[in-house]
Structures are given as C-alpha cells and as structure tokens.
C-alpha cells in the first residue's frame, strides 16, 4: 500500500523514514532482494522498488507493535510476533527479515502495484480537463480492486476487532472535495470497508465524503493509509483529520454506505450554501484562548461574542462549553430555521461555533455568514474531538456525544446532566424501553430499578402494554412528547448562558433524540 505521498524518483528512504521515524530502516541487508520481481517491472516502477521494499518492511514491523503501560510517558516500544516478545528494534528487524521474507515479498509486490496505479493516475490527472479529473483518474467500470490494500501478509484475526492483540478503534473524518462520480466512491468505500471488516456509516455526495468506521487498529490504520493515498483526497486529507477513539466494529450494528445530496444533512442544497465559504478556522489552542477571553468578561450577556453550539439538544445536554448558547433543536436540518428565527441575536456579534468533529460548522458557518449580520464567524477546527485531545480539562465540561452504540466519550469527570425522573446527576443514555420509540433517555440506576425506563409518561404507559406480532421491533413511530416539542425555539436577545452544573430536573415528559 502506498504512502500518502508518492515517492520521488530514486531511493526514497527519506520519505519512508519520515513516515516511520521510530524505526531504523537504513540497514536492509537482511532482506534478500527479489531479483525476479524487480526484473518484471517497467522502468518507471523499477525505480520505486527500493522504496516499496522498505515500506513493506516498515508496515509489517509496525503491525507487530504492542502497547505498553509506560509507552505514553517514555516512548518505550515492544513488538510481538510468532509468540515471541521483542524489546528492541534490532531483534524485531532481524526476526522479520529471516522469518517473514515471503510476507515482505508479497507486500512489496502489492505496494508496487499500487504505485503503478498512482503513477498512471498522476499522468492522467496532469493531462485531464481540470473540471473532470475523476473521469481520468478512476476506471470507467466499477472495478475497485486496484484501490484495496493487500492483506495477505496479515493474520486474519488481526483485522477483526476484539480478536487481535490490540484494542479496536473508531475513526471519525470528513473531506469536502467535489466528486464527479459519487456512486463509484460509494462502491469503492463499501468494498474497502468489507475488505477490512469495518462497520460504520459513510455518507457520500458530490461535495465530498463523511464517515465514521470501527474495527481493529490494524484495519483502521490500513483504511487511513488508503484514504491518504487516494488521488481525489490526498491533497485535502492528512492524518490529523482522522479523529480516533477507543471502540471497534462492535460500536455499529452494520456497515451503511450511501450517496446523498449532502454529506451532513443541513437540509439546504450545497449549490445554494457551499462549504467553500465557511467561517474562519481556529485551532484548538486558538479557540481555547478565545473562550478564555469570553469567559473572563464580567458580563457575558453584554459581550459582542456568542459561543454557539451547533449540535442537537441531546448532544449538548450531556456535555458543552461553559457559557455557550446551545439551541434546543432536535436535528441539524433545523439549524438554518433556528438562525432565521433568531437572526437579531447574531447581529453585530462575533460568533465562535463548534460541533463534534467540525463538519456541521463548515456549512453551518457558511449559512450564518451568508446572512450578513455577524461581525465575524469562527469555527473550531477538528471540533470538540480535537479540542479534548489537547484540553481534556479545559472549558468543555461533560461527555462528548457520538452517533454510535457507545453514545458518549468521556475525557473528564464532570457530569452536567441529570436523571429525567429524580434529578440526580446522570449522563449515560439508554434507549427508551418502548420498542416503537426512537428516543434516548437519561434514567439513573435507582429509577431504572423502579421501572422508570421510558422517555416520558406516555411511553412508559405504552411499554406496559405488550405488543405482539412480527412488527413489534421493526415498527417505529414518533414519540408524542417529540410531537409536542417546539420545533424551532426563539431565544431572548440576551441569551442565558448554559451553566456547567446540572440544570433543574426536567418534567417527566421531556423527550430524547430521534436517532439519525
């Protein structure tokens, strides 16, 4: 599998070392060169042989790395292979070179194949019409095999989350890039995820791709490598654009890949509001300073700055920035109407926007900017996810809601929400116990023990009446408490800051989210 950056001509050891700076790749004498493989290559690809061999070796060694309790503090590395534990680079390198030459050979051949495709693609792109690059860089058929990594040298169990030696992982990413053939990308992504045993959800549109996938760490690493080497995305994506968290394939019930009009459902055509005119990106460090400055003001209500949470109410309910304005909306597709209804609130204001991973702010900030009422519009690059990686004990309090079966990620010990029934501090969502309901509910163990497991009194009553028949689990209906909920709230011109401690306990009929 190729590097995210195609190597220059000649010996590309430097690129390989930059990509795997923790490995000593200079001494390759232990690997027997495959003269037959090299002899079969054309001139341009043959020049990449040295790079491919070193890259194959580095990738193989990297997959054998195991975490240690002290690795975070002192960069200690251990490797496990063939039921042996290796404590230094020299010993693991010697073992791989002498015992796994065949695997290195096959992986080298695979990398060379991918490099040949990349070289051909680059030549096609340079001569193609700039408005239609996809027609030149991808096959006209839906044969996606050229962009699937070779996994023959890996233990099959290593690709399956929970069965390998490492804990699984969940990736969250997006990439805005005009796509000529979203259907081809959809077919490729489906094949790629199935190939790597990944589950999750991926939305593809003419404006780009938005995905969250889970699997083993080996599988997610290979997925990132392929994405970074893919011609259409490699200039717009970098490794830091992939947010990672503990998890795996079990975090999603299945793999869903589809083509839509938008990669994040705001409900407005990208032709009307484009991602190309967003608010100014602030790094987590820059955003932290802006929030610190905002919170240090004696009277935030009189400030010219608004800290705006672009997420849904059930997300901000269990975690949010101090002093934020958190709209009481159920879907992101309600956000444009929320802005329209509360436009005066944003007039002559500096707006600091944030969301989970940054994607909603891209077009949400573009929509707010297009209204022409704000002084400035900023957005948190990488979203809360990246902010918490740098500032786990910063100004964001509580948990980070995620759209998978984990429901939330914890970076600090703060609990900012409460049980819907008794008002005790609680922030762990569960599905409403009524089979036909779509809601999430906050109910503490004590209340659960008393049978309070539904999102509202109406659902609690429905749950006590058993429903029989084949449609019991598949039929869904909107909860009555959702139907009664105001769709678009109107804020006071001097909005009330969200506190960092739990709010007063809600009425028993307060609803939870519709899962999307």
Curated annotation (Swiss-Prot):
Keyword Phosphoprotein: yes
Entries under PROSITE patterns matching the protein: RHODANESE_3 (PS50206)
Region (Disordered): 490-516
Oxidoreductase in keyword set: no
Alphabetical UniProt keywords: Phosphoprotein
Disulfide bonds: none
Positions with biased composition (Acidic residues): 506-516
Rhodanese domain segment(s): 301-396
Modification Phosphoserine, positions: 269
Gene3D superfamilies: 3.30.70.100, Rhodanese-like domain (3.40.250.10)
Residue positions of the active site: 355 (cysteine persulfide intermediate)
Transmembrane segments: none
SMART domains to which the protein is assigned, alphabetical: RHOD
Protein name, per record: Thiosulfate sulfurtransferase/rhodanese-like domain-containing protein 2
């Amino acid at each position: 599998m190729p590097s995210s950056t195609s190597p220059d001509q000649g010996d590309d050891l430097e690129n390989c070392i930059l990509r795997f700076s923790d490995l000593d790749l200079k001494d390759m004498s232990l690997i027997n060169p495959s003269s037959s493989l090299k002899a079969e290559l054309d001139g341009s690809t043959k020049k990449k042989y040295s790079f491919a061999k070193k890259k194959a070796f580095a990738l193989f060694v990297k997959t054998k790395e195991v975490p240690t309790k002290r690795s975070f503090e002192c960069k200690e590395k251990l490797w496990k292979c063939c039921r042996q534990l290796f404590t230094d680079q020299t010993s693991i390198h010697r073992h791989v070179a002498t015992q796994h030459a065949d695997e290195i050979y096959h992986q080298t051949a695979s990398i060379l194949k991918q490099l040949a495709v990349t070289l051909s693609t680059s030549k096609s792109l340079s001569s193609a019409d700039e408005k239609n690059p996809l027609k030149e860089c991808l096959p006209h058929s839906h044969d996606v095999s050229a962009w699937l990594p070779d996994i023959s040298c890996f233990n099959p169990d290593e690709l399956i989350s929970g069965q390998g030696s490492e804990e699984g992982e969940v990736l969250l990413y997006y990439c805005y890039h005009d796509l000529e053939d979203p259907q081809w990308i959809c077919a490729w992504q489906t094949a790629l995820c199935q190939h790597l045993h990944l589950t999750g959800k991926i939305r593809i549109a003419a404006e780009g791709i938005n995905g969250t996938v889970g699997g083993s760490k080996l599988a997610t690493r290979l997925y990132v490598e392929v994405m970074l080497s893919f011609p259409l995305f490699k200039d717009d994506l970098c490794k830091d654009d992939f947010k990672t968290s503990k998890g795996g394939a079990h975090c999603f019930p299945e793999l869903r890949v589809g083509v839509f009009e938008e990669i994040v459902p705001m409900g407005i055509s990208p032709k009307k509001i484009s991602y190309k005119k967003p608010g100014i990106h602030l790094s987590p460090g820059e955003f932290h300073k802006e929030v610190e400055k905002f919170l240090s003001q004696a009277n935030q209500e009189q400030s010219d700055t608004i800290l705006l949470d672009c997420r849904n109410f059930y997300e901000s309910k269990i975690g949010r920035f101090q002093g934020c304005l958190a709209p009481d909306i159920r879907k992101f597709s309600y956000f444009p109407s929320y802005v329209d209804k509360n436009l005066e609130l944003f007039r002559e204001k500096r707006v600091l926007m944030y969301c989970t991973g940054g994607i909603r702010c891209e077009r949400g900030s573009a929509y707010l900017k297009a209204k022409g009422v704000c002084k400035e519009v900023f957005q948190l690059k990488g979203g809360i996810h990246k902010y918490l990686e740098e500032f786990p004990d910063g100004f964001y309090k509580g948990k980070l809601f995620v759209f998978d079966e984990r429901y939330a990620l914890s970076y600090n010990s703060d609990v900012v929400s409460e049980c819907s029934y008794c008002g005790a501090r609680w922030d762990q969502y569960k599905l409403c116990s009524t089979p036909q309901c779509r809601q999430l509910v906050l109910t503490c163990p004590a209340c659960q023990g008393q049978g309070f497991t539904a999102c509202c009194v109406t659902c609690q009553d429905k749950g006590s009446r058993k429903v029989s028949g084949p449609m019991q689990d598949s039929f869904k209906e909107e909860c009555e408490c959702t139907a009664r909920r105001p769709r678009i709230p109107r804020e006071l011109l001097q909005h009330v800051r969200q506190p960092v401690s739990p709010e007063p306990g809600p009425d028993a009929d307060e609803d939870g989210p519709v899962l999307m």
